[in-house]
Amino acid sequence: MIMSSKEVEIIWHQIISEVEILMDQEPELAGFYHAYILQHDSFDMALSYILSNQLSNKVMSTVFVRDIINKVYIACRKIVAYAIQDIKALFNHGLVHCYSFSLLHSKGFHALQAYRISNFLWCEEKKSLALYFQNRISCLFSVDIHPASMIGSGIVLDNAIGITIGQTSAIKDSVSVLSQSLALLGSAFKISSVQCPKINEGVIIGANVAILGNVVIGEKTKIQACTVVLQSVPPNSIVTSVLAKIVSFKNINE
């Protein structure tokens, strides 16, 4: 369900209130809070400012990157609503103590919002620009999300280092990755028409999980840490296993 513009405004004003309190508590950060939050008239303007300062470089200036992001937000307001839902998901899981923390400090949140820009550009056939954003996301956050992958709203990427999401992956709403190193990739050695996993709504994924191949993870499934998933999982399951199989062996004494 996409949030209304009124709901977005409610969260934005809550963020402003939180930042004003934080600024009173630590006035040394007044310039930081003003630049990132208080000088902006809307949530999407603040988010585009934050992302553009991260994704720019010496060739692609901050002003140029911000102009691209602002145009995306104007063309697709759904992306802004998704960002708010992602912030709420982090808060509702108890991973942050206030809404403003995610917007200001969460690299998983920032990587996800930058992916949403790249996905829009990819769908608009601006694939080289989308791949530029993918590369910047990978370099900055150690997160590799293909621009063509499909990711819903209310997504939690906590401690996002090492997350890899392949081109044909699909992640529905309210999916949580509660620690680092998730791999959603096609099966190895199958080059043509590689199909990546499909993750249904409400799935919770632990640390260091690999989900490989054309598999479907049923809704509200919990995948525990250090699990390798190679086959589809029915809804409402709890999955735990570490798979290893010798595919060839050479006697070193031969």
UniProtKB/Swiss-Prot annotation:
- Protein's cellular compartments: Cytoplasm
Record has Cytoplasm as a keyword: yes
Keywords, A to Z, come to:
Acyltransferase, Amino-acid biosynthesis, Cysteine biosynthesis, Cytoplasm, Repeat, Transferase
Q: What class of enzyme is it?
A: transferase
Q: What is its EC number?
A: 2.3.1.30
Per the record, its GO cellular-component terms are: cytoplasm
Task: Kindly list the GO molecular function terms attached to this UniProt entry.
Answer: serine O-acetyltransferase activity
**InterPro entries xref list:** Hexapep, LbH_SAT, Ser_AcTrfase_N, Ser_AcTrfase_N_sf, Trimer_LpxA-like_sf
Q: In which pathway does it act?
A: Amino-acid biosynthesis; L-cysteine biosynthesis; L-cysteine from L-serine: step 1/2
The family note in this entry says: Belongs to the transferase hexapeptide repeat family.
- What PANTHER family does the record tag this protein with? SERINE ACETYLTRANSFERASE (PTHR42811)
- Can you say what this protein is called? Serine acetyltransferase
Annotated source species:
Buchnera aphidicola subsp. Baizongia pistaciae (strain Bp)
